[in-house]
Amino acid sequence: MKKIIACIGTFFALVTLSTQAKNPYLLQTADRSAMEHWVDSVFETLSPKERIAQLLVITVRNSDTPQNRKTLQRLIQEQKIGGLLFDSGTAKDQANLTNYCQSLSKVPLMITLDGEWGLAMRLSDTPRFPVNMMLGAVQNDSLLYEYGRAVGKQCRRMGIHVNFAPVLDINSNPRNPVIGKRSFGESLKNVSSKAIAYAKGLESVGVMAVAKHFPGHGDTSEDSHKTLPLVPHSKERLMSTEIPPFKAYIDSGLSGIMVGHLNIPAWDATNTPSSLSPIITRELLCDSLNFEGLIFTDALKMKGASKFGNTALRAILAGNDIALNPSKPEEQLNSILSAIEQGKITQQAIDEKCKKVLRYKYVFGLANYTPIKTKNLIEDLNAPEYDALNRKLNSEAMTLL
């Protein structure tokens, strides 16, 4: 794993923010032969249903209680899901639960974090870095890269492989109830440069960055947690304003993108959320923008998507690789199995996505999984280097504000 991380760091040291590479660097850092051998060896042990389950990441409680452990045991041993997203709690509980869940899983789990400005967005006993809107005032992008590396190191210490960050939404609508301080600002150029620097910092230490909320949640007046927001703009406006930060991110060789739940009639007039729309996810993101990394939906329990039914199946059909937190995972798995039997989706399509997920698990070091060391965990997460970085970020941001 140390060799992989060293290679990643070398890649990003040699590549500027304007690089036009499309293939994600995380995969390029791996020994291709060794990776494919591990992927094939794991894949061959999986039943058709278990291959589908690798495409689900489920949100779980971050509370280390006997009752929650029983719930997690059923989820992992019966449904054999591919990954977890812990909700808010403490670092100690999450570390203990991660070790417990990994010990139960047939295939090592992908552990994800919704940490737009670091662990403290979800974990109470960790350093609290400035929110993105404040970081947008930092002129030196190399400091944002350093910040990304720091968050990445903390993620690695916590056994976290994927961070659902950075936010690439442009804060262009003062009536937007959900983006606001989560955005790096109102300037397209500034949002792109800050977010990409942060993302490169994350990936330089082997943590996948997942930019969101494609194709752009900044200019809406509704919250996709509660409804399906309308984005009323023309294709020309979207391609000139909302899309460029994502295009720059893709061209920089970064690995993950999250598709939001948005109603965008200019592209898809069927009132279908972008996360469930083949036109937006497959045709625009994959075919037009040439994104070859891992595609996650936003959480499928959100009101912007949940009312459409069979959300995991629809998400996979639309072109996503990972269905994030659909309701009733067992029913979702069976729905996809039925769709294969009915010819709505092929087993080959599922197998290709399963292998894609396994390749990233290999890059994360899960071929040689080791439990989180809980001794000195809180001290390590609150090391003096992070406090010094925090002061530097606040100082540079406040100087400009």
Language model features: what each stretch is:
Residues Q20-I58, N62-R74, D287, K307-L401:
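Preference for extracellular/luminal or secreted protein segments
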